[in-house]
């Protein structure tokens, strides 16, 4: 009955075409049957492909100029593409935010009436709900006050992080600062392991609340950031400067927040959204989140494409839907470094998602320690906790990548990936398992990918000119 009422409302507005139009997502129709308003995302026909191709085909004197040109071109593209709709919305009381990184427009608390009107614009090709795509359960593991030892945690020893950093400092006289961004629940900026490596200005953005300083009401983001750049034996590369965007408000992540964070990564602003400075963009971005992957799941593809053009290395957790084959999550399943999780004994963690992807692509790309990993807790400045998940494995991938970029900051994505693959350790606990027609004793495979990360071996492959 409620769906019939919804259609009647549209008809009374004179919008029969909108009712029948495939522009309006079926899920959005169902949402309006339950609630009178909802946040929506509008997709425009122009898209970003032409801009990305143009920027990719041109040469720029340096990365900063590339990023500025990319962000400017995408912004102008969205203004031209969306001008009629933006002008229309300006005559209403609805709040909107342009997503130039994907040529989309977010509208807050949209109504049935508004959707019917928006669907009539010929340049609009799709209108869908700004869904909550991923949820975090709040960490419940015990809180530890202080660390029992200043020595590196077992997971850092596994990936030979300290040895790699020592080698890096022995062979490099002018090591550049590497900026690493997390898109997560935030970070406790005052934590003893993290306060010294925070980038500071241009290091934080909260799309929802526009909070001034990094914060974390969940703990997931603090933990993963600690594994990347934490001091005191918990971080893979503590010399990195961390940045963070709050793509997940407390226990959930919306499409808008994640896309908006992806846009901020390309050209960071101050926390209030002002004074963009593309030169502050991170060199890599760590994403410890994943959603179910179907052929229709493409909503983050354009963000990843833009990152590649802007020379931002994307690292993703592969998902926690194992142990069955074909369970890899999105976006770790596309053209990114997708990281699975291993245990203290170098077996695959039972929760770690396994490939192949639904398109037959080999995934995960690599694996890293992800079970029983100790890192910073959000509950106190000297508190820690142990967590498990591919969320914990992903920041190892980011940390190792940061070490490699510190050796050669201008490396391409493909060369970074080649170094990770070349150095990966294949002396792992296999079981003869077959996924996608590949047994796990043959590398690469769909269980371990190319192997478990080894920062030292990967760095040595670069220094020795093996790749």
Language model features with spans:
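Inhibitory N-terminal propeptides of secreted protease zymogens
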Residues: 19-139
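N-terminal domain-start motif of subtilase-like serine proteases
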Residues: 19-34, 97-99, 109-116, 139-182, ...
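Solvent-exposed loop/turn segments at secondary-structure junctions
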Residues: 46-50, 102-104, 114, 131-135, ...
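Hydrolase catalytic cores
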Residues: 225, 243-248, 370-443
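Cleavable N-terminal signal peptides of Sec/SRP-targeted secreted and luminal proteins
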Residues: 2-18
């Amino acid at each position: 009955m409620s769906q019939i009422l919804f259609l009647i409302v549209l008809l009374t507005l004179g919008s029969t075409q909108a009712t029948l139009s495939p522009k309006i997502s079926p899920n959005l129709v169902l949402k309006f049957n339950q609630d009178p308003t909802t946040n929506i995302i509008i997709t425009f026909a122009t898209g970003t492909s032409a801009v990305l191709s143009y920027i990719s085909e041109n040469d720029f004197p340096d990365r900063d100029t590339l990023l500025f040109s990319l962000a400017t071109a995408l912004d102008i593209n969205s203004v031209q593409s969306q001008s009629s709709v933006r002008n229309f919305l300006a005559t209403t009381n609805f709040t909107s935010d342009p997503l130039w990184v994907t040529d989309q427009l977010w509208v807050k608390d949209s109504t049935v009436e508004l959707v019917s009107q928006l669907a009539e614009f010929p340049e609009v090709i799709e209108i869908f709900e700004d869904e909550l795509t991923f949820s975090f359960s709040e960490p419940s593991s015990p809180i530890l006050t202080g660390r029992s030892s200043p020595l590196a945690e077992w997971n850092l020893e596994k990936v030979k992080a300290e040895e790699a950093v020592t080698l890096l400092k022995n062979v490099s006289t002018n090591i550049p600062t590497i900026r690493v961004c997390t898109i997560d629940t935030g970070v406790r900026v005052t934590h003893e392991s993290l306060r010294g490596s925070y980038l500071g200005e241009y290091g934080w953005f909260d799309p929802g609340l526009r909070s001034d300083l990094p914060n974390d009401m969940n703990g997931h983001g603090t933990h993963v950031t600690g594994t990347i750049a934490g001091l005191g034996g918990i971080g893979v590369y503590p010399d990195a400067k961390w940045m963070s965007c709050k793509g997940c408000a407390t226990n959930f992540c919306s499409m808008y927040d994640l896309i908006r964070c992806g846009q901020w990564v390309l050209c960071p602003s101050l926390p209030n959204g002002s004074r963009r400075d593309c030169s502050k963009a991170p060199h890599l971005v760590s994403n410890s989140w994943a959603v179910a992957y179907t052929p229709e799941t493409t909503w983050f593809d354009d963000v990843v494409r833009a990152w590649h053009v802007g020379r931002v290395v994307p690292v993703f957790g592969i998902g926690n839907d194992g142990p069955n084959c074909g369970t890899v999550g999105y976006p770790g399943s596309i053209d990114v470094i997708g990281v699975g999780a291993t245990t203290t004994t170098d077996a695959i963690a039972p929760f770690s998602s396994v490939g192949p992807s639904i398109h037959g692509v080999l995934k995960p790309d690599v694996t890293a320690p992800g079970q029983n990993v100790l890192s910073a807790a959000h509950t106190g400045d000297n508190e820690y906790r142990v967590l498990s998940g591919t969320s914990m494995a992903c920041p190892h991938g980011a940390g190792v990548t940061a070490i490699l970029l510190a050796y050669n900051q201008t490396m391409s994505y493909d060369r970074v990936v080649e170094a990770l693959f070349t150095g990966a350790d294949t002396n792992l606990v296999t079981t003869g398992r077959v996924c996608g027609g590949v047994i796990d004793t043959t590398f690469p495979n769909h269980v371990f990918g190319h192997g478990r990360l080894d920062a030292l071996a990967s760095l040595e492959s670069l220094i020795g000119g093996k790749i």
